[in-house]
Swiss-Prot record:
Cross-referenced CDD domains: KH-I_PNPase, RNase_PH_PNPase_1, RNase_PH_PNPase_2, S1_PNPase
Residues that bind Mg(2+): 486, 492
GO BP: any one term: RNA processing
Protein name: Polyribonucleotide nucleotidyltransferase
Listed GO CC annotations: cytosol
Pfam family, one: S1
EC numbers, comma separated: 2.7.7.8
S1 motif domain boundaries: 622-690
Domain of life of the native organism: Bacteria
A single GO molecular function term of this UniProt record: RNA binding
SUPFAM superfamilies noted in UniProt: Eukaryotic type KH-domain (KH-domain type I) (SSF54791), Nucleic acid-binding proteins (SSF50249), Ribonuclease PH domain 2-like (SSF55666), Ribosomal protein S5 domain 2-like (SSF54211)
Keywords from the named record: Cytoplasm, Magnesium, Metal-binding, Nucleotidyltransferase, RNA-binding, Transferase
Gene3D superfamilies assigned to the protein according to its UniProt record, in alphabetical order: GHMP Kinase, N-terminal domain, K Homology domain, type 1, Nucleic acid-binding proteins
Length: 720
């Protein structure tokens, strides 16, 4: 019944298994990928024909994690998986990026790739398994695909690279790098690092590329037994070949002249006018050929721009290949924000705002591996006005989530330790203008905003986007690329870091692969650009401000014995709620006895501290405390002191001399001063008012005689 095939190989000391022919047999390609007990079902399906008028490749990649994979039931009212989480979106992009360049040019059939996590062993991350499985599914499907690709994760533990580290090893690693590519070269890199050198980053990429070579061999071996017949691509229409030639003759000069304009919006207007004139000149307006011609004009644009750069070394806006656009950094531009910055680089601009919060503001993430809390968030927004358009507004899309995470990875390694700076941090980046490299503008602006907010970063962080123009005859690496250079080029290579080293690196290749030599040149050129940008940023602010903004909460940390936590919280949280209501401060209590008190008012903070210390402090014999009478009886009065602690003032200790009734001296609600005499055999506190001057709070033990009894006078009054 099943036409089943299986391939096993060793991957970093663990067994990777690829199976096909048993599950999802109606998909064009289906592979069950397994590493340890982590299992991902990967499928690929393609439409047999393109939609009429389609002029782009509609590839969709969906990565989804099922709660049952970790033995869980989803939360929420409906108790089923809902919209993709941020993590699922990021992994979907991780799979999409290395496979997209490997479909043939002009292939416009819809293709859908789905990766479903069926089992998670809490040791092997499913993302690499999913990417490998999706590559295998496409290779088996018969869909035109110039693969296979494979991927590996590289860690750096105790100074040595580790291939596909476990979740436990990743927690100790100074590097989290994912590299994907073909047997010949690298297609995609994504990483977070603790200020590593460019040489270390390049060595990690090479280590990862070498590490996944057996996976490519295994996919090819599996395809030899189980691949479907390859699809037959339609031959190029001779009429289209002729149309392309006519467009080249009629449009090369017009488009070339339009690209001489240095200002983005004016250039776009001239390009649009040139295209319209070309269509009119050829007399194909309103015909089926018009849509085909518009698609071909994109290729002509790319050819004009790319060859101009290779021939002259001069780019669209007049720069050479290494020059960074003019930079202006400003901080403190929003008066009520905790920290703010406006970072402008040419025609790209980011308004970044930092907000400081408490532990109650941490993001709670319910992941397959368990619930955890994140105290640093970075949100990237790309409104349509940033490119002069009217468009959709709503929840963030995949691109915004991906760019935000890239900037997060760049800044995260330089944040202070949580115990040294116990704030929850949120940075929002509003892209107010865009002409390329907005994610790297976010990195720079976020660094400035955090320093403006008083966050003691280890060092400022800057980012730069590199591009590549590569033809058989030559190549050029471009620093600080424009939007058009990103669109028409062969590489988007983003590097962020400090003056000490790289904190994040992301590379996407639009051609089949690039060489180590090109990567080395790009990394060195990026370092030069990064140093220049850091110098420009230093003109705005060189380090964190000495204190947080007046509008930000001040967090004071105190520690109490672990066994006292229950007393501070109270039954059902009653005591802590009363303290919060009384003081107006926010209070976070951790299991180890650390208590964080946050308020914009010092008075509010001190009120909370006094209450808490009163609860946890132990009464000291001989010490005088302020108290309040909470109950009276024939034999004395109960006084509340040290927060919620009560003690007994015996009637003989109320005052010097004879006392007939307790109420003759004090009543409920009276504020008094008491001295701790000791503890009875049940641990109850014995107090005295008689030995304390109730006006000054002075200890007068040496000035009074023996205590008096009930119904009689004492042996002495105040000593003369």
């Amino acid at each position: 019944m099943f036409n089943y095939f299986r391939k096993e190989l060793d991957l970093g000391g663990r067994t990777l298994v690829l199976e096909t022919g048993k599950i999802a047999r109606q998909a064009d390609g289906a592979v069950l990928a397994r590493l340890g007990d982590t299992i991902v079902l990967c499928t690929a399906v393609g439409a047999k024909s393109a939609k009429a008028g389609q002029d782009f490749f509609p590839l969709t990649v969906n990565y989804q994690e099922k709660a049952f994979a970790a033995g869980k039931i989803p939360g929420g009212f409906f108790k089923r998986e809902g919209r993709p989480s941020e993590h699922e979106t990021l992994v979907s992009r991780l799979i999409d990026r290395p496979i997209r360049p490997l479909f043939p040019e002009g292939f416009y059939n819809e293709v859908q790739v789905i990766a479903t996590v069926l089992s998670h062993d809490m040791e092997n991350d499913p993302d690499i398994v999913a990417l490998i499985g999706c590559s295998a599914a496409l290779t088996l499907s018969g869909i035109p695909f110039f693969g296979p690709v494979a991927a590996s994760r590289v860690g750096l533990v105790n100074g040595a690279f580790v291939l596909n580290p476990t979740l436990e090893q990743r927690a100790e690693s100074k590097l989290d790098l994912v590299v994907a590519g073909t047997a010949e070269g690298v297609l995609m890199v994504e990483s977070e690092a603790e200020e590593l050198s460019e040489d270390q980053m390049l060595a990690a990429v090479e280590f990862g590329h070498k590490g996944f070579q057996p996976v490519i061999d295994a996919i090819i071996a599996l395809a030899e037994h189980a691949a479907r017949d390859p699809w037959t691509l339609p031959e190029q229409n001779p009429e289209h070949v002729a149309l392309k030639q006519r467009l080249n003759e009629a449009g090369r000069t017009l488009l070339g002249n339009a690209y001489q304009e240095k200002v983005k919006q004016l250039r776009q207007e001239k390009i649009s006018a040139a295209k319209k004139q070309i269509i009119e000149t050829l007399g194909i307006g309103g015909t089926p050929e018009e849509s085909i011609a518009k698609s071909m004009l994109k290729d002509l644009e790319a050819d004009i721009v790319r060859n101009a750069i290779l021939d002259t070394g001069i780019r669209i806006d007049g720069r050479d290949t290494r020059t960074v656009r003019p930079i202006i950094g400003e901080v403190g531009i929003l008066p009520r924000a905790h920290g703010s910055a406006l970072f402008t680089r040419g025609e790209t601009q980011a308004l970044c705002v930092a907000t400081l919060g408490t532990g109650q503001d941490e993001q709670v993430v319910d992941a397959l591996t368990g619930e955890y809390r994140s105290h640093f968030m970075l949100h990237y927004n790309f409104p349509p006005y940033s490119v002069g358009e009217a468009g959709r507004m709503g929840s963030p899309g995949r691109r915004e989530i991906g760019h935000g995470k890239l900037a997060w990875r760049a800044v995260h390694p330089v944040l202070p330790a949580k115990d040294a700076f116990p704030y929850t941090l949120r940075v929002v980046s509003e892209i107010t203008e865009s002409n390329g490299s907005s994610s790297m503008a976010t990195v720079c602006g976020s660094s400035l905003a955090l320093m403006d907010a008083g966050v003691p970063l280890k060092r400022p962080v800057a980012g730069i986007a590199m591009g590549l123009i590569k033809e058989d005859r030559a190549f050029a690496v471009l620093s600080d690329i424009l939007g058009d250079e990103d669109h028409l080029g062969d590489m988007d290579f983003k590097v962020a870091g400090t003056e000490q080293g790289v904190t994040s690196l992301q590379m996407d290749i639009k051609i089949t692969s690039i060489t180590t030599e090109i990567m080395r040149i790009a990394l060195q050129q990026a370092r030069d650009g990064r140093m220049h940008i850091l110098g420009e940023m230093a003109k705005a602010i060189t380090g964190a401000r000495g204190s947080v903004a007046a509008t930000a909460p001040r967090i004071t940390v105190i520690n109490v014995p672990k066994e006292k936590i229950r007393e501070v919280i109270g039954t059902g949280g009653k005591v802590i709620r009363e303290i919060v209501e009384f003081s107006g401060a926010k209070i976070d209590i951790e299991d180890d006895g650390t208590i964080k008190i946050a308020s914009t008012s010092e008075e509010s903070t001190q009120k909370a501290i006094d209450r808490i210390q009163g609860i946890v402090a132990e009464p000291e014999v001989g010490k005088i405390y302020n108290g309040k009478v909470v109950k009276t009886a024939d034999f004395g009065a109960f006084v509340n002191f040290l927060g919620s602690r009560d003690g007994l003032v015996h009637i003989s200790e109320l005052q010097q001399g004879r006392v007939n009734k307790t109420s003759d001296v004090i009543n409920v609600g009276d504020v008094v001063k008491v001295k701790v005499l000791g503890f009875d055999d049940r641990g109850k506190v014995k107090l005295s008012m008689r030995l304390v001057d109730q006006t000054t709070g002075e200890d007068i033990s040496d000035k009074v005689g023996p205590k008096g009894g009930r119904g009689g006078r004492g042996e002495g009054d105040l000593a003369e």
